[in-house]
């Protein structure tokens, strides 16, 4: 075991002297289905999470849904007030495709949906809060899913049409665009697995065919912006990929190679086509999948190839790399292997992962406080992909519903994470901002309301969905204001206020 992994947990008080750049963008993040509610309000169409939670409620741990969630559809002004309380520079949120285009297609634009997001964006800008907008955060219109969703070869065209409508309506004010949030979770958990909607569980090809369709759709939405809107609107467009760090368990060549294969399977499928110099799917992993496919009797690889034209089209389709980061895993070529469906993406990777028991555990079984995790990920990506601009678009910590307002574990996590951010900046990573997940407690997908990530507690039982700041909100507010991480800072009150200028 590598000694630095344990030593890295120690946070030295001298870190408090290091400053974030004055132009570093601090914010928080949310997603439409997780907070908005109003699932059928004012002409909104059904999306895949509406459909799954209504027809298969047992798919959610507590049998809940996002029908009301935090009711941001009616409470968006309170949400912006919370942003002002924290002193945020930016707020990352997603648009509900079905709220804008109820049927998913471009022929029927819902004016009420457009008005809602106009009001939301204008309320932020009134207080100098920069909107960072995600086009797709997992809530596909159900009509498009009925037609095959991401697997339909027309999907990139549908997404391009949607993106164009969004740019036309909001691009005069929105200057930071993200096409997709977390392709791995979309493709593996929704198509290759049965954890997230649409829960197709097509383990052999679902992940791979979804991945190709998604990156093609991303490129089409990117080039629509570049060719038709960028000159007049002056914004930037990227994609957000979940990049947790994969470290070799030992210094052996076998474990180092296993860690690299796991990185390719986890996020390389989505990053390599866009950010690498060669384009296309990761070479080593695609060769593994092809070999196993032939051994399993498939007439061709279960991972589709890009044509030369497609590869060149996708390659370089970005202005920045959005990184959602939460934790790390130690990867072994032989030990700690779990059973996976055969064939599937993780059976193809065929590696084991280990989490040391001394790493602090959150309410989510997959989320621990791993040492210097953000720095490890970002410096690796910087070297691999020729120093793109980065934003941390999600990073956060989960608590159980009864955790209360004194969330010292979340504070410990954020301080460690932000120290790792400073390490990355000092290492030369071109990191422009950090979005904490999340502004408020919300519907946590298949876990319902059993795992909560908010800086603000939400009383989901109250008609008003009352928001109350947790202790971590005050600590994050102080970091934003001072631009330093003071490990000894303790808020003197849990009564929130808005500073002058916000």
Model segments located where?
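Cleavable N-terminal signal peptides of Sec/SRP-targeted secreted and luminal proteins
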Residues: 1-16
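Short, well-structured secondary-structure segments
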Residues: 89-96, 130-134
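Short secondary-structure capping/turn segments at boundaries of alpha-helices and beta-strands
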Residues: 15, 79-80
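Active-site mouth loops of central-metabolism enzymes
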Residues: 61-75
């Amino acid at each position: 075991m590598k000694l630095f992994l344990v030593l890295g947990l120690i946070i030295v008080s001298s870190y408090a002297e290091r400053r974030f750049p004055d132009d570093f963008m601090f914010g928080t993040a949310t997603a439409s289905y997780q907070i908005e509610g109003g699932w059928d309000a004012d002409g909104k169409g059904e999306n895949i999470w509406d459909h799954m939670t209504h027809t298969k409620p047992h798919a959610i741990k507590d049998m809940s849904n996002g029908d009301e969630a935090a009711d941001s559809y009616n409470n968006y002004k309170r949400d912006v007030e919370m942003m002002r309380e924290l002193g945020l520079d930016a707020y990352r949120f997603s648009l509900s495709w079905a709220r804008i285009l109820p049927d998913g297609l471009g022929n029927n634009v819902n004016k009420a949906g457009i008005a809602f997001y106009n009001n939301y964006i204008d309320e932020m800008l009134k207080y100098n809060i920069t909107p960072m907008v995600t086009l797709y955060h997992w809530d596909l219109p159900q009509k498009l899913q009925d037609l095959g969703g991401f697997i339909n070869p027309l999907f990139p065209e549908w997404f391009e049409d949607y993106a164009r409508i969004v740019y036309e309506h909001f691009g005069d004010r929105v200057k930071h665009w993200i096409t997709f949030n977390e392709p791995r979770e979309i493709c593996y958990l929704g198509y290759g697995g049965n954890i997230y909607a649409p829960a197709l569980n097509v383990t052999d090809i679902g992940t791979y065919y979804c991945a190709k369709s998604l990156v093609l759709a991303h490129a089409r939405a990117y080039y629509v912006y570049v060719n038709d809107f960028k000159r007049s609107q002056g914004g930037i467009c990227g994609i957000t990929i979940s990049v947790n760090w994969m470290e070799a368990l030992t210094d052996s060549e076998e474990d180092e190679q296993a860690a690299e294969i796991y990185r390719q399977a986890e996020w390389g499928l989505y990053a390599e086509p866009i950010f690498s110099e060669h384009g296309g799917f990761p070479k080593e992993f695609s060769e593994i999948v092809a070999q196993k496919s032939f051994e399993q009797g498939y007439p061709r690889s279960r991972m589709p190839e890009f044509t030369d034209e497609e590869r060149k089209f996708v390659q370089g389709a970005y202005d920045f790399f959005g990184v959602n980061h939460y934790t790390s895993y130690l990867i072994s070529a032989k030990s700690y292997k779990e059973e996976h469906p055969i064939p599937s993406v993780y059976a193809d990777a065929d590696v084991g992962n280990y989490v040391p028991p001394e790493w602090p555990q959150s309410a989510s079984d997959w989320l621990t406080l791993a040492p210097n995790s953000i720095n490890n990920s970002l410096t690796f990506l910087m070297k691999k992909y020729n120093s793109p601009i980065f934003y941390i678009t999600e990073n956060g910590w989960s608590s159980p519903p009864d955790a209360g307002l004194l969330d010292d574990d979340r504070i410990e996590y954020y301080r460690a994470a932000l120290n790792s951010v400073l390490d990355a900046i000092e290492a030369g990573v071109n990191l422009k901002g950090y979005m904490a997940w999340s502004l408020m407690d919300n519907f946590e997908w298949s876990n319902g309301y059993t795992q909560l990530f908010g800086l603000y507690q939400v009383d989901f039982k109250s008609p008003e969905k009352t928001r109350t700041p947790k202790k971590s909100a005050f600590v994050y507010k102080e970091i934003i204001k001072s631009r330093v991480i003071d490990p000894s800072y303790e808020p003197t009150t849990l009564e929130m206020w808005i500073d002058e200028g916000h």
